[in-house]
């Protein structure tokens, strides 16, 4: 059962009047003085400043903190609703964190991109610093960050203790660095509240992430801002109403539309005048692709410092870190980060001993695997692309190195633009500077649950990697698809133990996994303390194979464990806590464990949580649904619903790019005065003109003689009429 955490905030502090955090009476003008600089290449890796605060000089020691990937992008939508990246915002060399010398519990989070901007936290008071506008010198404004928190408190936290998977127990410390790759979305109203300017809003989000990293430094955890999305003109989903419903709507939306660079967790930041809640999150689910997301509500009067604390608390809860029990938990700061009061307090805030233990326990389990992926980071300090560095950057079509070393016939090395005769320079759908034909395979299917992708005929890049929707049956209906793989228990056994291995017998699984020791279990509570599988969960515990060989299985990285059950040799593996392969010890999430049931975190649960709502019947029983819930049709059936059949169509989906290429009829252009070459008409084109001309001549001749005949007859008739009318005229006149 998921524990959905909804956090209520103090109405008196977020919903009512709050003192402005910059008070005129506390403002000071200071001129920071750089006294130390350590460079690596052309970038300062360490720097120290003297800063005067209230007539006292302090030394702030800073170390560069990288949290933007080298290909970071800020996205928004154009008037047609198509997502587009903004200009380069990937400058990531100028963000620092550190402390104030002589104050061991202090914290500093500073940006030096354009002057100093950020936060200085002493034990009981915090100061904001930012450049003084229109200053001739290096003058800055420094001010105390204050909160009217006399009445601030959480009215309740809906945490069901029974659903907190990880109990706090002692565990050895770890120096391993963990990473959270985060995608942040700023909705329309918050975008306006933060300044209504892309550069301003982006800088504030950078400040937030920098502050979060300063808080998480004690856990050796880095938040990477994978990408930023701004909803400037309109929101993609309604952001009003109940925050619980908003979270579920956001999760549903991001499954279909959030297809940017890889990320572990996505957050929607929403502005509300006087919210009752500060956010919503799924507890302990940060690495779950279906539930790795959250909502954070920004009130009208909250400070950037407080909003950073809210995001840290929400992320912490998503990693299984509960709120502190004031009677049991302690920290070195004035107030602990996972205390409800931390949102509204000034001064240094640190994680408690309870939070540190909970985090270490979480990262020692297989459900924290996504935090172990180290993203590619390198200093990006050029605001403009550099042509000739062998890297395609913003504003470039291609980059093949210097003019001397470039061997790309499609790319102009001097401008990093395509040559006039080229349509593309690189990519699986580019061949000799031309796009490959629409429908040509550019990415083969790698699994029964994977789908092939095709060139679309208008780009050198391959289509997005698509796969069969999670929950679809595979391997003769025995297993199900999960993230493009058929989660076969037998395949996992062979991947883990060897290609000749077979899955353990029912007796192996049932008798071993109902124990609570190293041979079989349903999870590790703490080193040496194992959790026995319940009566319905033993198929989801330790992964076990049957072994009938005489030689010993060898595994240099883990411990191989043998057990004799009913005359069968049953084998499992034990990896040390935090090992990169520790997830292989247990049956994978999504493995079938019963009718309409699958394994999930060592429990056999209903498969309904997968949201398998797009079935072959949705596709008229002539296809399967892909991960975007669009039909991928069988050959000869036509997307989007696979209802109609056409023998000339190859099937596929509206996403895969393999709709058959329909050649455009050749267009004949009438040459104008600028073209002087003579035109040679083919003989077969002259014949129709000759026939038409002959018919016209014959028609004209016929009409001519017909008219002549009519005139002769008319003349004769006129004479007869005159002769007949004369007596009548005289007769009338005689009267």
From Swiss-Prot:
Chain residues in the propeptide: 16-176
Entry GO terms, CC: plasma membrane
Q: Which residues are glycosylated?
A: 55, 220, 288, 353, 456, 564
Q: What is known of its domains?
A: A tripeptide motif (TDE) within disintegrin-like domain could be involved in the binding to egg integrin receptor and thus could mediate sperm/egg binding.
Q: Which InterPro entries match?
A: ADAM_Cys-rich (IPR006586), Disintegrin_CS (IPR018358), Disintegrin_dom (IPR001762), Disintegrin_dom_sf (IPR036436), EGF-like_dom (IPR000742), MetalloPept_cat_dom_sf (IPR024079), Peptidase_M12B (IPR001590), Peptidase_M12B_N (IPR002870)
Give the PANTHER family listed for this entry.
ADAM A DISINTEGRIN AND METALLOPROTEASE DOMAIN (PTHR11905), DISINTEGRIN AND METALLOPROTEINASE DOMAIN-CONTAINING PROTEIN 2 (PTHR11905:SF108)
The name under which this protein is listed is Disintegrin and metalloproteinase domain-containing protein 2
Q: How is it modified after translation?
A: The signal and the metalloprotease domain are cleaved during the epididymal maturation of the spermatozoa.
Q: In terms of domain of life, where is this protein from?
A: Eukaryota
List residues of the EGF-like domain: 610-643
- Give the location in the cell: Membrane
The Peptidase M12B domain extends over 178-375
What residue ranges lie in the Cytoplasmic compartment? 702-735
Q: Which UniProt keywords apply?
A: Cell adhesion, Disulfide bond, EGF-like domain, Glycoprotein, Membrane, Phosphoprotein, Signal, Transmembrane, Transmembrane helix
> Using the chain's own numbering, where are the disulfide bonds?
287-370, 329-354, 331-336, 442-455, 614-625, 619-631, 633-642
Q: Which GO terms describe its molecular function?
A: metalloendopeptidase activity
An example GO biological process term is: binding of sperm to zona pellucida
